[in-house]
């Protein structure tokens, strides 16, 4: 049985010494009580030595985890001083004081950091106890004003655990109903399953009082009962009275005291030590299955985390080489999966992957950037008009000059360089993010990660430069030759016949299909109408609708997209909103939404706004183009030219440019993503798979590159310690035989027959610190002296006859509830009690019924026998 306590001590030491916090509540006994209640004295009596600090005020200022182990030699060990044995218990006391002051200071401060002390002695039973600070009311020294609450919280930190037994220490010379220890225990253990009562200072009670009712578990009963002890007095301590002599004096006190001699074998420090040993052993046995389950769960969690650490040896070069190869292979698979996409088991459902973001750049952002660079209709016609007139010069042209078409188209094609270069920059930026994410698993080796990122980034930058050259070369190809014989080109004949309401550049007939859904905020709603708030928007090729939420059941409004354009909204410096805003508006100035000229929409980030703009672009809503203002009357006169032949030529060139630019932009949107994929992304993937490892070996010393970071080494050691401690703990617990015999927990205390509040004068036992009732005058019998006079009442049951078989109290007269109450109080009180004997009230004697008189005679006779036996026993002892 004691091996169970030893096991828990080993677990406690293993976890504490390794610095492992396993979230396991190991079975222990916490000693709780008020200040100067005698807690430390009880612990010293267990050990048989003076080793705990003493003094006035609060002395125990840190929890002391005391492990008592039965051994051949007598010495102590502290967990914070490993390997040092303290043979002198005076040195142990000094070390406790010094260690307390190191953490809390020397001016009565407190701390919840425990001190672990293990005491080996042939005079102790295996126990694990926690000495906690005593409850105090007033702060002294540098203690905070809420010292009482802090101490309570510290105590609750230990006793609220279901695996902790509570040793509630209460002095006998105080009222048990006001016991701080029992009050705290009641809060966390209302059923009393874990609480053991200890009554100290029994020898200091007032003369004529005793704690028999408490020790017999009749006053404020506990499920595990009370045990009384007698500690050394302050005079004994100052006189260096040996604890063994004190234990002998304690035994003599209980054997000689008339109120305690009948239960002397169930009182005293040795009995308390045996009870605690048995109770703790049983408690450990009951909690071991749950402890094993927690350890197994911890083990399963730790096994996944330490799988890569199990066979790791920091000094082994082969293991480092293997680790490098494994991480490069992991990088290759992660990079490819991020770019190409992953299977259903590994797909990320929280955010877009790098490949998905690059896809959005190709098909949304590039299209949007190209359209932003295009001129609007009015600007384009003005440029065509200038080109035609400048080509003709002083001559009057009879035919539409094709050189004007070529000049305008080249200007439009040259504008494509900026958006395609920006597309390359966006892809490279996203690719750098992907590389950083994929190398995150190399964080254990910061130099390796840094070198890997440097090599890959350098290669990507080189490919970026090459890709930009090739893409600009594609634009130069378009500038070098105008293929007016293209099958999709409209031609001069069709251009002249085309109406001026021809399709605008880049438009597509999509039908009324849904293009995008998502949340946006309408910014320009008035305060009286609810202010800005988020809505669920549905964008189609013909309209945009918004709903209250994504269920799309309550539609707020539907806005047609015909003739609308986009513009950015700049937030003023007084604006409190940090959201990015854009607006839908009509170029002709009509109201767009109710009384509003524009509908202002906002998103959280710039990326979201740009994505929405690209979606609007697919629906045919283009960004606003700022018109350049010309100065002078010449510009006004040029723009107001009304030459019908020039207007026809402008319209023809306009249709030709529109048709040819559709071909060029279509080719550009198709070829740019292909060039980026081949020259950057696929090349980077091939580089990582085929050349990265060689560059790493050539870059420097692999031993330095594979040095662990301090954080990773600390975490690895901690994880391995936790894993080994958990594994050892499971092995220790697994070796325990669960066939041990334990005493069952006592049944719950039944006191429902007691009157509420114990206020009945016949049944109410006195408090330990109170004075028992003084004897009243002898009652006169109405039978003329047939019966002997009643003895004065002592207010308690009669003393027991020594060495009676069973050690219990004498048989009680029948008729009492449960047969376990003390005899009724004799008629010495002027209280109006009825049916007890002859009661004197207002000078008149009243007779007692015959049946009750017989019971009184029987009790009196038994009391006389007991007193005679006690006197005889003490005389010839």
UniProtKB/Swiss-Prot annotation:
Q: Where is the composition biased (Pro residues)?
A: 788-826
Q: Name one GO biological process term.
A: regulation of growth
Q: Changing residue 268 to D: what effect?
A: In allele shi-TS1; temperature sensitive larval and adult paralysis
Give yes or no: UniProt keyword Hydrolase: yes
For the GED domain, which residue ranges apply? Answer: 650-741
Q: What GO molecular-function term can you cite, just one?
A: GTP binding
Q: Where in the cell is it found?
A: Cytoplasm; Cytoplasm, Cytoskeleton
PROSITE patterns noted in UniProt: G_DYNAMIN_1 (PS00410), G_DYNAMIN_2 (PS51718), GED (PS51388), PH_DOMAIN (PS50003)
User: Region labeled G3 motif — which residues?
Assistant: 131-134
> What InterPro entries does its record include?
Dynamin, Dynamin_GTPase, Dynamin_GTPase_CS, Dynamin_N, Dynamin_stalk, G_DYNAMIN_dom, GED, GED_dom
G4 motif as annotated region, ranges: 200-203
Q: Where is this region: G2 motif?
A: 59-61
Ranges for domain Dynamin-type G come to 23-289
Q: What is its main location?
A: cytoplasm
Which cellular components does GO assign to this protein? cytoplasm; microtubule; mitotic spindle; neuromuscular junction; plasma membrane; presynapse; sperm individualization complex; synapse
Outline the segment boundaries, as ranges, of region: G1 motif: 33-40
Compositionally biased region (Acidic residues): 630-641
> Can you give the residue ranges of the PH domain?
513-621
Keywords from the UniProt entry = Cytoplasm, Cytoskeleton, Endocytosis, GTP-binding, Hydrolase, Microtubule, Motor protein, Nucleotide-binding, Phosphoprotein
The domain of life for this entry's organism is Eukaryota
Q: Where is this region: Disordered?
A: 623-648, 740-834
Other comment:
Shibire mutation is the cause of temperature-sensitive paralysis. This is believed to be due to a reversible block of endocytosis, which prevents membrane cycling and thus depletes synaptic vesicles.
Q: According to its UniProt record, which protein family does this protein belong to?
A: Belongs to the TRAFAC class dynamin-like GTPase superfamily. Dynamin/Fzo/YdjA family.
| Name of the protein this chain belongs to | Dynamin
């Amino acid at each position: 049985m004691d091996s169970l306590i030893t096991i828990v001590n080993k677990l406690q030491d293993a976890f504490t010494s390794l610095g492992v916090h396993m979230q396991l509540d190991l079975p222990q006994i916490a000693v709780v009580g008020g200040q100067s209640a005698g807690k430390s004295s009880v612990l010293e009596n267990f050990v048989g030595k003076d080793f705990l600090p003493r003094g006035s005020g609060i002395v125990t200022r840190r929890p002391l985890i005391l492990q008592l182990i039965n051994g051949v030699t007598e010495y102590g060990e502290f967990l914070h001083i490993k390997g040092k044995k303290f043979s002198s218990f005076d040195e142990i006391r000094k070390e406790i004081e010094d260690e307390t002051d190191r953490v809390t200071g020397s001016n009565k401060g407190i701390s919840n950091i425990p001190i672990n002390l293990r005491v080996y002695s042939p005079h102790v039973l295996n126990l694990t106890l926690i000495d906690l600070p005593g409850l105090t009311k007033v702060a002294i020294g540098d203690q905070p004003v809420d010292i009482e609450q802090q101490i309570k919280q510290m105590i609750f930190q230990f006793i609220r655990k279901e695996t902790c037994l509570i040793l509630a220490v209460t002095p006998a010379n105080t009222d048990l109903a006001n016991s701080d220890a029992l009050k705290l225990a009641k809060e966390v253990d209302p059923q009393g399953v874990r609480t053991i009562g200890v009554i100290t200072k029994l020898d200091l009670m007032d003369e004529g009082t005793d704690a028999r009712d408490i020790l017999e578990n009749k006053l404020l009963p506990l499920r595990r009962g009370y045990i009384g002890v007698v500690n050394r007095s302050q005079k004994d301590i100052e006189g260096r009275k040996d604890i063994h002599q004190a234990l002998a004096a304690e035994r003599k006190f209980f054997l000689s005291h008339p109120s305690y001699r009948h239960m002397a074998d169930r009182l005293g420090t040795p009995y308390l030590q045996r009870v605690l040993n048995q109770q703790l052993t049983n408690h450990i046995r009951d909690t071991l299955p749950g402890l094993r389950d927690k350890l197994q769960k911890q083990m399963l969690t730790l096994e996944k985390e330490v799988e890569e650490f199990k066979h790791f040896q920091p000094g082994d070069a082969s293991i480092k080489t293997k680790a490098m190869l494994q991480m490069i292979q992991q990088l290759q698979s992660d990079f490819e999966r991020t770019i190409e996409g992953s299977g259903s088991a590994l797909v990320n459902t929280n955010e877009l992957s790098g490949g998905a973001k690059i896809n959005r750049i190709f098909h949304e952002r590039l299209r949007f950037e190209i359209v932003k660079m295009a001129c609007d209709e009015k600007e384009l016609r003005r440029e065509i008009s200038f080109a035609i007139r400048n080509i003709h010069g002083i001559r009057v042209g009879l035919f539409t000059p094709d050189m004007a078409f070529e000049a305008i188209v080249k200007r439009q094609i040259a504008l494509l360089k900026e958006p395609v270069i920006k597309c390359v920059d966006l892809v490279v930026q996203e690719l750098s993010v992907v590389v950083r994410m994929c190398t995150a698993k190399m964080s254990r080796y910061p130099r390796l990660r840094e070198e890997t990122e440097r090599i890959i980034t350098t290669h990507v930058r080189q490919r970026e430069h090459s890709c930009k050259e090739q893409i600009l070369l594609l634009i130069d190809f378009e500038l070098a030759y105008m293929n007016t014989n293209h099958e999709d080109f409209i031609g001069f004949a069709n251009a002249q016949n085309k109406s001026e309401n021809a399709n605008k550049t880049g438009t597509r007939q999509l039908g009324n299909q849904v293009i995008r859904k998502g949340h946006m905020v309408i910014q320009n709603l008035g305060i009286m109408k609810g202010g800005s708030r988020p809505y669920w928007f549905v964008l189609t090729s013909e309209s945009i609708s918004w709903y209250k939420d994504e269920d799309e059941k309550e539609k707020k409004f539907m806005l047609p997209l015909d003739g609308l354009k986009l513009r950015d909204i700049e937030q003023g410096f007084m604006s409190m909103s940090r959201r990015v805003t854009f607006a839908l508006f009509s170029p002709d100035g009509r109201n767009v939404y109710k009384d509003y000229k524009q509908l202002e929409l906002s998103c959280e980030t710039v990326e979201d706004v740009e994505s929405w703009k690209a979606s609007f672009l697919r629906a045919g809503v283009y960004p606003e183009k700022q018109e350049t203002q010309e100065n002078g009357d010449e510009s006004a006169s040029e723009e107001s030219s009304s030459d019908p032949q020039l207007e026809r030529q402008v319209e023809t060139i306009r249709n030709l440019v529109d048709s040819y630019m559709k071909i060029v932009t279509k080719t550009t949107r198709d070829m740019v993503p292909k060039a980026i994929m081949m020259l950057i992304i696929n090349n980077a993937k091939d580089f990582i798979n085929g050349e990265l490892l060689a560059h790493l070996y050539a870059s420097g010393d692999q031993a330095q590159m594979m040095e662990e970071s301090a954080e990773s080494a600390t975490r690895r050691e901690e994880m391995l310690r936790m894993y080994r401690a958990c594994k050892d703990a499971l092995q220790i617990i697994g070796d325990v035989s669960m066939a041990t015999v334990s005493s069952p927990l006592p049944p719950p205390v039944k006191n429902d027959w007691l009157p509420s509040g114990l206020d009945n004068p016949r049944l109410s036992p006195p408090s330990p610190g109170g004075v028992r009732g003084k004897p009243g005058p002898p009652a006169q019998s109405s039978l003329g002296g047939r019966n002997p006079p009643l003895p004065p009442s002592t207010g308690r049951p009669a003393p027991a006859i020594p060495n009676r078989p069973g050690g219990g109290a004498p048989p009680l007269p029948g008729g009492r509830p449960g047969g376990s109450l003390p005899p009724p109080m004799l008629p010495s009180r002027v209280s109006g009690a009825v049916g007890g004997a002859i009661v004197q009230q207002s000078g008149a004697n009243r007779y007692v019924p015959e049946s009750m008189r017989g019971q009184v005679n029987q009790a009196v006779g038994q009391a006389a026998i007991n007193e005679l036996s006690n006197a005889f026993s003490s005389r010839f002892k």
